[in-house]
Regions:
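C-terminal regions of proteins
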Residues: 270-339
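Membrane-embedded segments
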Residues: 71, 77-165
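Secreted/periplasmic serine-hydrolase-like ester/acetyl group-modifying domain
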Residues: 132, 145-249
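N-terminal Lys/Arg-rich, disordered targeting/topogenic segments
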Residues: 1-16
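Short extracytoplasmic
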Residues: 55-83
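Hydrophobic membrane-insertion alpha-helices, especially the h-region
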Residues: 18-39
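Alpha-helical transmembrane signal-anchor/signal-peptide segments
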Residues: 39-60
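Active-site segments of SGNH/GDSL-like serine hydrolases
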Residues: 244-270
Length: 339
């Protein structure tokens, strides 16, 4: 091959590379345009194909649609430790239309992201309920969690959203939503976000599982949990900042969810002192918002010693969840009646 033919070959490869690059960029731009217009999780960033709902899916992504739904004026935030609080029960007792935005397996970082999303779409909510459990006791300001969460979906940064749309799982949902939007019989995810995990636990025979029974009855160690001994609790700091930004009329209820007796530390132990310090830091955030109340469902009482009311040390049954919901509702009614 002579110099001339080599030059031609290089030119051909350069032309091919340019065509390939232009094609790839075109396909990428085309996909992103389609994904933005379809808005796979009904985030409201595009309303061209908005159905005001999503097809049945997990709460990590379904919360994008629920959290912006103007039908709701109150929300519950947390994880599975507050998931059993039924929004319809709260609504019936308070007159406030509630949505459940709790997401199992999440900690303060994810919950504060959802809190911010809800407030961007409901700048003056009538009420918010926040569950604070031991995940909030981390001393890491990054508020880490080992479970994946779509922070990009709730980010105010448009570029973060576009990067999130490039995920393969999201591309699958784009295709799925197109089929759902134009389907004759499309099932919708539950509008208020409530999911009854008691039914799931009972179907799995959790109450009869000896291994789980032993785990439930095993006392927690006396030593403080690693990374949760304080004295700094950055999640509480961020919560205080969020509460301070709420309108004065918004009623806030902070809940320490129930814990089975074996899951509570022995008084006077390092673990008890660390957990108390964490709860005190969380409770202190309520000073940043006057119309607020604290419900400590961890307080000593016979129900916390009843194994029939708990699936494990932190997941309780309706017999505890319903009275807790009523207690929350009563607190909201009192707060809303406060001048």
């Amino acid at each position: 091959m002579g110099p001339a033919s080599g030059s031609v070959a290089r030119q051909d490869w350069a032309a091919f590379a340019r065509r390939f690059l232009r094609t790839a960029i075109g396909l990428l731009a085309g996909y992103l345009t389609l994904a933005v217009l379809i808005d796979p999780y009904d985030s409201g960033r595009s309303t061209l194909f908005s159905a005001g709902a999503v097809r049945p899916q997990g709460p990590r992504t379904a919360a994008a649609s629920r959290g912006r739904d103007p039908a709701f004026a109150g929300a519950v935030f947390g994880n599975s430790h507050i998931q059993l609080i039924e929004p319809a029960r709260l609504t019936a007792a308070t007159g406030i239309p509630f949505v459940q935005l709790s997401v199992p397996g999440t900690g303060p970082g994810e919950q504060l992201a959802l809190f911010g999303w809800f407030l961007r779409h409901h700048p003056a909510p009538q009420a918010v309920i926040l569950s604070v459990d031991d995940f909030w006791c981390t001393d890491d300001p990054a508020l880490p969690n080992d479970k994946p969460f779509p922070f990009w979906l709730y980010s105010p940064d448009p570029l973060a959203y576009l990067r999130g749309l490039l995920r393969f799982s999201v591309a699958q949902e784009v295709v799925g939503r197109i089929g759902w939007l134009f389907g004759a019989r499309r099932k919708r995810a539950v509008a208020d976000g409530w999911s009854d995990y008691e039914l799931d636990f009972l179907k799995r025979g959790t109450l009869d599982d000896e291994r789980l029974r032993v785990m439930r009855e095993t006392p927690v160690p006396d030593a403080a949990a690693p990374g949760k001994a304080g004295p700094d609790f950055p999640a509480a700091d961020r919560l205080g900042t969020a509460l301070a930004a709420l309108p004065a009329e918004t009623a806030v209820v902070l809940v320490f969810p129930p814990v089975y007796a074996a899951g509570l530390p022995r008084p006077g132990t390092p673990r008890a002192k660390a957990e108390a310090a964490c709860r005190n830091a969380a409770a202190a955030t309520l000073q940043r918002h006057r119309r607020s109340a604290l419900i400590d469902a961890r307080r000593e009482r016979p129900a916390l010693h009843d194994p029939g009311l708990f699936f494990d040390q932190t997941h309780y049954r309706h017999a505890l969840a319903r009275p807790l919901a009523d207690e929350i509702a009563a607190a909201l009614v009192r707060l809303r009646g406060t001048p």
